[in-house]
Design a protein with these regions (language model features):
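Sequence/structural segment immediately N-terminal to covalent heme-attachment motifs in c-type
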Residues: 1-21, 39
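Structured segments of extracytoplasmic/periplasmic soluble domains
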Residues: 11-14, 18, 33, 46-53, ...
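Flexible coil segments in periplasmic/lumen-exposed cytochrome c-class electron-transfer proteins
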Residues: 72-142
Length: 142
């Protein structure tokens, strides 16, 4: 069985970057930002129901490890205190209800507005709701 980091690198790193910093203006960074979504109940579900997550060819167990790696390792300080890890049962249920009938960009933009309005997230998360999703690179990412 592969480690969650290895699964991330194989399944997500090509678009979201090896350390969670995307090389594309159209793909959101995960590093120090993905955890903000866990301030909202729908945000937690959103992460587990994204089509590339829900339809991934990995097992529920591996996907649970992958989501927890993304949130707790890549999410850094953006993860709310007291956040519980995803459970196998939760991930199994979420991926059976994939987001397919909604605009993912509109849904993400709405959550970003709510998070910023409620002071759950820094304003650099606003980039998730704009055309240029990239956060400024940190020195260690350059």
């Amino acid at each position: 069985m592969q480690t969650p980091r290895a699964n991330y690198l194989l399944s997500c790193g090509g678009c979201h970057g090896l350390n969670g910093v995307s090389n594309s203006r159209l793909v959101p960074d995960l590093k120090d930002q993905v955890g903000f979504f866990l301030n909202l109940p729908e945000g937690r579900g959103y992460l587990g129901r994204l089509p590339n997550v829900a339809f991934s060819i990995t097992t529920d167990e591996a996907l649970t490890g992958l989501l927890n790696y993304m949130v707790f390792t890549l999410g850094g300080a953006s993860v709310p205190k007291g956040t519980k890890p995803y459970t196998l049962r939760e991930v199994s249920q979420l991926r059976r209800q994939p987001l397919t009938e909604v605009s993912l960009v509109q849904m993400r933009q709405h959550m970003v507005r709510v998070l910023i309005d409620q002071d759950h997230a820094t304003t650099n998360l606003r980039r998730y709701g704009e055309n240029d999703y990239r956060s400024p690179p940190s020195p260690q990412d350059q």
